[in-house]
């Protein structure tokens, strides 16, 4: 077993060797290096064919038509294109958007920008288990609502929203529905031929593909229109200009092909590993699981260890690569906005750790992690005056601290 152990697969994943192999075939003079928009010679045709194959591999995994896949530089750009593209195109119909407080920053910050441009956004608070209340969603819908954006799997707590029910509700009201599926694709089945989802953001680097490439699914029937945010040569049916990065797209395609083959077995394996981890640490005093144990992704476990500072716990777990909150916001010392939205106190939100497992995680690594967590929590609580007071039966919340 190699140390340190990587348990931060929701931040990014290593590229699968099979994916790297395919990508390398698209870089050098002997490979498929042409510009796919070069229609006048074989180098361009080969590149175009490689992209067509990848587009089909991605569409196959999610039950889409390959013509509905628009390549972007990643899920953040896909989120921006979906929200700004719809808002700009349909603004004469209405200027109201609905999302939730626990969305990824790429959604929340895009919504903030649209608010500055004159749109109105309703931010729904989730229930304490992280799920959105459909009645609240319906109550928030208005005649001028043009878009709902609610993610499939939350990147911090792994809670799974009922995108099928949300899609039905949106379709019945004639409202466009966007889903950020960055954390769910390849872990949970997605069939867009059955789901009433109009736009769906995808990433490659969360599923053993390369960074810097993603896609936006844009439904053709009923047809969804977007205003382009990137202008130029009119690539991707005018929705996203820019020369297509053949090696990255081929890598994404291969990653999605592997997911389609291996997803069923891998989901079962990850679920077992996640439960093994939880069963190994749930007997620690004052430990709480964040989110819902039933409606959850197979690979994410977010836990709060009361009376232990999350940052110091991460330092103590020097042989485990874990995070507090998501990588996109882990540089800030603010408590996680996702956990605060669930109603956690600052203290509990600060004491949370996200463990995310993946393709190369083993039982041996999980058992080692359990051992390390037990000893680190013991050591840190021995140093904690708050823990001592808690053990003496003092109600910490009732203490009035004096500020110096």
Swiss-Prot record:
Cofactor: pyridoxal 5'-phosphate
Location in or out of the cell: Cytoplasm
Sites bearing N6-(pyridoxal phosphate)lysine, chain numbering: 206
Catalysed conversion reaction: (sulfur carrier)-H + L-cysteine = (sulfur carrier)-SH + L-alanine
Keyword Transferase included in the entry's annotation: yes
Binding site for pyridoxal 5'-phosphate: 75-76, 155, 183, 203-205, 243
Pathway of action: Cofactor biosynthesis; iron-sulfur cluster biosynthesis
Pfam families referenced in this protein's UniProt entry, alphabetically: Aminotran_5 (PF00266)
InterPro entries given in the database record: Aminotrans_V_dom, Aminotrans_V_PyrdxlP_BS, Cys_deSase_IscS, Cysteine_dSase, PyrdxlP-dep_Trfase, PyrdxlP-dep_Trfase_major, PyrdxlP-dep_Trfase_small
EC number: 2.8.1.7
Entry keyword Metal-binding: yes
Active site (UniProt): 328
Residues the entry annotates as binding [2Fe-2S] cluster: 328
Paired cysteines (S-S): none
Biological-process GO terms, alphabetical: [2Fe-2S] cluster assembly
Gene Ontology MF terms in the entry: 2 iron, 2 sulfur cluster binding; cysteine desulfurase activity; metal ion binding; pyridoxal phosphate binding
Keyword terms, alphabetized: 2Fe-2S, Cytoplasm, Iron, Iron-sulfur, Metal-binding, Pyridoxal phosphate, Transferase
Main location: cytoplasm
SUPFAM superfamilies reported for this sequence: PLP-dependent transferases (SSF53383)
Quaternary structure and partners: Homodimer. Forms a heterotetramer with IscU, interacts with other sulfur acceptors.
Family according to the record: Belongs to the class-V pyridoxal-phosphate-dependent aminotransferase family. NifS/IscS subfamily.
Stated role: Master enzyme that delivers sulfur to a number of partners involved in Fe-S cluster assembly, tRNA modification or cofactor biosynthesis. Catalyzes the removal of elemental sulfur atoms from cysteine to produce alanine. Functions as a sulfur delivery protein for Fe-S cluster synthesis onto IscU, an Fe-S scaffold assembly protein, as well as other S acceptor proteins.
PANTHER family per the UniProt record, alphabetical: CYSTEINE DESULFURASE, CYSTEINE DESULFURYLASE FAMILY MEMBER
Protein known as: Cysteine desulfurase IscS
Species name: Proteus mirabilis (strain HI4320)
Lineage, top ranks: Bacteria, Pseudomonadati, Pseudomonadota, Gammaproteobacteria, Enterobacterales
Name of the gene encoding the protein in the UniProt record: iscS
């Amino acid at each position: 077993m190699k140390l340190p152990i990587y348990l931060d697969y929701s931040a990014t994943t290593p590229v699968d060797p099979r994916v790297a192999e395919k990508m390398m075939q698209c870089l050098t003079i002997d490979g498929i290096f042409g510009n796919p928009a070069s229609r006048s010679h074989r180098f361009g045709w080969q590149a175009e064919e490689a992209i067509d194959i990848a587009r089909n591999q991605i569409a196959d995994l999610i039950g889409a038509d390959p013509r509905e896949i628009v390549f972007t530089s990643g899920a953040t750009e896909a989120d921006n294109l979906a929200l700004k593209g719809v808002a700009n195109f349909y603004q004469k119909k209405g200027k109201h958007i609905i999302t939730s407080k626990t969305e990824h920053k790429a959604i929340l910050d895009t919504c903030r920008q649209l608010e500055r441009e004159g749109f109105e956004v309703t931010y729904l608070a989730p229930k304490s288990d992280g799920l959105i209340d459909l009645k609240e969603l319906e109550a928030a819908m208005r005649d001028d609502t043009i878009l709902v954006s609610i993610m499939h799997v939350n990147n911090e707590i792994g809670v799974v929203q009922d995108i099928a029910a949300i899609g039905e509700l949106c379709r019945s009201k004639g409202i466009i529905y966007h889903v950020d599926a960055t954390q769910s694709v390849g872990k949970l089945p997605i069939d867009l031929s059955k789901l009433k989802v109009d736009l769906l953001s995808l990433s490659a680097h969360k599923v053993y593909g390369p960074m810097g490439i993603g896609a936006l699914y844009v439904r053709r029937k009923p047809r969804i229109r977007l205003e382009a945010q990137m202008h130029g040569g009119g690539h991707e049916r005018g929705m996203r200009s820019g020369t297509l990065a053949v090696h990255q797209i081929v890598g994404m395609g291969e990653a999605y092909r592997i997911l389609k083959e291996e997803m069923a077995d891998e989901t079962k394996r990850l679920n077992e590993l996640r439960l093994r981890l939880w069963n190994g640490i749930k007997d620690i005093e004052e430990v709480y699981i964040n989110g819902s144990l039933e409606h959850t992704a197979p690979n994410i476990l977010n836990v709060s260890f009361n009376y232990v500072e999350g940052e110091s716990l991460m330092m103590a777990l020097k042989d485990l690569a874990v995070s507090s909150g998501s990588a996109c916001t882990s540089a800030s010392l603010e408590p996680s906005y996702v956990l605060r939205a669930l109603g956690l106190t600052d203290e509990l939100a600060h004491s949370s750790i996200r463990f995310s497992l993946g393709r190369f995680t083993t039982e041996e690594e999980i058992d080692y992690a359990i051992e390390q967590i037990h000893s680190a929590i013991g050591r840190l609580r021995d140093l904690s005056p708050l823990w001592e007071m808690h053990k003496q039966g003092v109600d910490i919340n009732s203490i009035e601290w004096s500020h110096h």
